[in-house]
A protein has these predicted regions:
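Helicase motor core with emphasis on the C-terminal RecA-like subdomain
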Residues: 1-10, 14-18, 22-44, 51-56, ...
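Short, low-complexity, intrinsically disordered N-terminal peptides in bacterial proteins
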Residues: 1-2, 476, 535-536
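A generic structural motif
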Residues: 30-32, 56, 290, 497-499, ...
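ABC nucleotide-binding domain signature
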Residues: 59
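Residue-level detector of conserved, well-ordered beta-strand and adjacent loop positions
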Residues: 89, 262, 374, 493, ...
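C-terminal accessory region of SF2 helicases/translocases
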Residues: 282, 308-317, 323-495, 499-513, ...
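Intrinsically disordered, low-complexity, charged/polar segments
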Residues: 519-536
């Protein structure tokens, strides 16, 4: 059966997009692949359709249980054994987990959904390896990159874990990954000569609008104007949990029934709200960034941000939830200059070097579980996870058997490890803050917003997008494929900031992402006249 025929007979799809086909063919040839496609462009199909044709089960690694549940339900409602999916997670009992393994082993199910945490258990890894998986699909692959906006330390071990189950071909999927994040994904997952498919990040059905608000009252009136004009459902993103609760109450009192959602709510309550929103029972959801992954809802008519997001990465991911049905949708950013200070506050403080040193010393003594380390150090789960991630990145920690963590054989001394981890944390904070600066530049630009946003992700648009407020107001100017002294995506070096990658040109400016200091916008004229950059 061909890919197109499988898509038609198993999923009822009449056609596949060219970028989907390119990625699927790589999977069919048993090649590793990295796929960057916009939200709603059918990324899941890229592993699901080939998996139905390739002998052997497929392991799907995904960060959120809600995201897994939606994909499992979508596969199982088709009632075909070659599409049946099972799951191993903290939500399943030991009996259910054993039954899932049995179903895969006996050929009654094709897809095994699992989290990195479950796969890191050596006994579980051995069970999965014995199934001889034919393919590994990694959803939300940008979570593995410390360059990314949604970094998850438990993803760091995936390269090691995939080796542990026999290193089958890997397809890594994400909706948002700038060039350095793509490079990081390839390196950390140890992808071998992967097929890289990056396509179609422009969303022509989204009208992108930004308004700088002089007062809170103006911000409120702009929101109400949109709610009065537009149909439901929609999502309003706010920066804090308190803001979510207060705005939902204020909207409801004003005659616009709304619910709030944030990470501080009980798991059960969040799940109920998630399901209610998908079922069109919640017309307006006011949420923090905790509401996002797993929201596969095609008819979201608008997305509003009530403050400046922390980065173009987050913004792009969140606005991508609108208009997945292809119908016109609005995305509106209402921001104030004070939002930048708030995001700098959220980027947090730096780790304590003494705590890092003590933790590194413990790991050198003997491997321990996270529970044991929490009891010994007194560190909370979040801080411990951050510290272990930093120590792993500087070669002072590594996963061991029985869910333990230890120090590599030739790890640095605790003092050196702590200093290196602190330096890495400082670098990450600098990069994070530079992303906020890029977000502000996007909000303030009078140029085409589509060009500006895609340039951040390393995509050059030679024509204006035609679907943003600046294009509508006539301030956008086509850059005619602006070029400069260095090719886009070339590696360059600055005498002070070190190595970097050229991302884009816009009029007389160029954007470069430096490893040490993050995103910088430079004058092309000054770079050329003063020889500030050299090819690396």
């Amino acid at each position: 059966m061909t890919l197109r025929r499988a898509a038609r007979s198993l999923f009822g799809w009449k056609a596949l997009r060219p970028n989907q086909l390119a990625a699927m063919r790589a999977v069919m040839k048993r090649r590793d692949a990295l796929v960057v496609l916009p939200t709603g462009a059918g990324k899941s199909a890229i592993y699901q359709i080939p998996a139905s044709l390739i002998p052997g089960p497929t392991v799907v690694i995904s960060p959120l249980l809600a995201l897994q549940q939606d994909q499992i339900a979508s596969l199982n409602e088709r009632q075909r054994p070659e599409l049946r999916a099972v799951r191993i997670s903290s939500n399943e009992s030991p009996t259910q987990q054993a039954e899932a393994i049995t179903e895969i082993r006996e050929g009654r199910a094709e897809f095994l959904f699992i989290t990195p945490e479950q796969l890191s258990n050596p006994d579980r890894m051995a069970e999965v390896a014995a199934l001889k998986p034919a393919l590994v699909a990694i959803d939300e692959a940008h979570c593995i990159s410390a360059w990314g906006h949604d970094f998850r330390p438990d993803y760091l071990a995936l390269g090691h874990l995939i080796d542990g189950i026999g290193r089958p071909p890997v397809v890594a999927l994400t909706a948002t990954a700038s060039p350095p994040v793509r490079d990081d994904i390839i390196a950390r997952l140890r992808l071998r000569d992967p097929e890289v498919v990056v396509s179609g990040l422009d969303r022509p059905n989204l009208f992108v609008e930004v308004a700088q608000c002089a007062t809170e009252d103006y911000r409120w009136r702009r929101l109400i104007a949109l709610l009065s004009d537009d149909e439901r459902p929609g999502i309003i993103y706010v920066p804090t949990r308190r803001a979510a609760e207060e705005l939902a109450t204020r909207l409801t009192d004003a005659g616009y029934p709304a619910q709030f959602y944030h990470g501080g709510m009980a798991t059960g309550a969040r799940h109920e709200l998630h399901e209610a929103f998908l079922a069109d029972q919640v017309p307006i959801m006011v949420a923090t960034s905790a509401f996002g992954m797993g929201i596969d809802k095609p008819n979201i008519a608008w997305v509003v941000h009530m403050a400046l997001p922390d980065s173009p990465d987050s913004y792009f991911q969140e606005i991508g939830r609108a208009g997945r049905d292809g119908q016109p949708a609005r995305v509106l950013l209402l921001w104030q200059a004070e939002d930048v200070g708030l995001q700098r506050f959220f980027s947090g403080g730096l780790p304590d070097v003494d705590e890092l040193r003590d933790l590194a010393a413990l790991l050198r003594k003997k491997p321990a579980t996270k529970t044991e380390l929490r009891e010994t150090t007194g560190l909370g789960p979040r801080k411990l996870g951050q510290y272990l991630s930093l120590l792993e990145q500087v070669g002072a920690a590594e996963p061991r058997a029985r869910q333990r963590i230890g120090a590599p054989r030739y790890s640095p001394t605790p003092t050196d490890a702590a200093a290196a981890a602190l330096a890495e944390a400082e670098r990450q904070q600098t990069v994070t803050r530079s992303r906020t600066d890029m977000m502000r530049a996007f909000a303030e630009t009078t140029a085409c917003r589509g060009q500006t946003l895609l340039a951040y992700f390393g995509e050059q648009m030679t024509q204006v997008c035609g679907h943003c407020d600046n294009c509508h107001n006539g301030t956008s100017v086509a850059d005619q494929g602006a070029v400069g002294p260095f090719p886009v995506h070339s590696q360059v070096r600055h005498p002070e900031w070190g190595p970097g990658m050229v991302l884009s040109y816009e009029e007389d400016k160029m954007t470069v992402l430096f490893e040490e200091v993050g995103y910088k916008t430079l004058s092309v004229r000054v770079v050329s006249e003063q020889g500030l950059l050299t090819l690396d």
